[in-house]
Amino acid sequence: MTETDKKQEQENHAECEDKPKPCCVCKPEKEERDTCILFNGQDSEKCKEFIEKYKECMKGYGFEVPSAN
C-alpha cells in the first residue's frame, strides 16, 4: 500500500466516524412521525407534515429517506 493509499484510507475512515448513524439523529421528529402513524395509519394525510419534517431533518445530516410509494 502506497503512502497516498494510506492517507486516502485514513480520510475515508475519519469521514465515517464523523457522520452520525441514522438511528441517532432526528429523534424528536422520528417520535412524532411514528406516533402519528401508529394512531392514524401510514397513509393518513394527518401524518404527512410529520413525515416531511423527519425527511428534511435526515437530509440535513446527509441521509436520503426513500418515499414509501
UniProtKB/Swiss-Prot annotation:
Domain CHCH residue range list: 23-65
One Pfam family hit: COX17
Motif Cx9C motif 2 location, chain numbering: 47-57
Example GO molecular function: copper chaperone activity
GO CC annotation: cytosol; mitochondrial intermembrane space; mitochondrion
SS bonds (residue pairs): 26-57, 36-47
Subcellular location: Mitochondrion intermembrane space
Predominant subcellular localization, coarse grouping: mitochondrion
Binding site for Cu cation: 23-24
InterPro entries according to UniProt: Cys_alpha_HP_mot_SF, Cyt_c_oxidase_Cu-chaperone
Family of this protein: Belongs to the COX17 family.
Functional description taken from the UniProt entry: Copper chaperone for cytochrome c oxidase (COX). Binds two copper ions and deliver them to the Cu(A) site of COX.
Protein name as annotated: Cytochrome c oxidase copper chaperone
